[in-house]
Amino acid sequence: MSENYIQMIGQDKIYPIIRCKEASQTIEIAKALVEGGIRVLEINVENPSIYEAIQEVSKFANVCAGGIITSMQADAALECGAKLFSSPIFQMNMVKISKNKQVPFIAGASTANEAYNAW
């Protein structure tokens, strides 16, 4: 992990999450965010076409693939160039993927039990 993406997010004080159904719209929004100085942005994986956007945007930005809940999604996003990934829920298998591939993972928690297990 040569870059500290989590530190960049903290320094930028903003973490944009792009949720679009169309890859082209996602790419245009990402370009505008980067032109505005954003260093890390999240692209939520709404559907399979969004991997195309991750692949394109990762050429000019640090992309976090968001909404990842399966190992197949994580692998696909990382293969497309995502530098980190996030999930709306806590799953230990996502932590294992993060450690094995040496990429940051931002875990969400929807319940007290999920938060406790993540701790």
Task: Map each language-model feature to its residues.
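Conserved N-terminal beta1-alpha1 strand-loop-helix module at the mouth
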Residues: 1-81, 100
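Conserved anion-binding
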Residues: 49, 69-73, 78-119
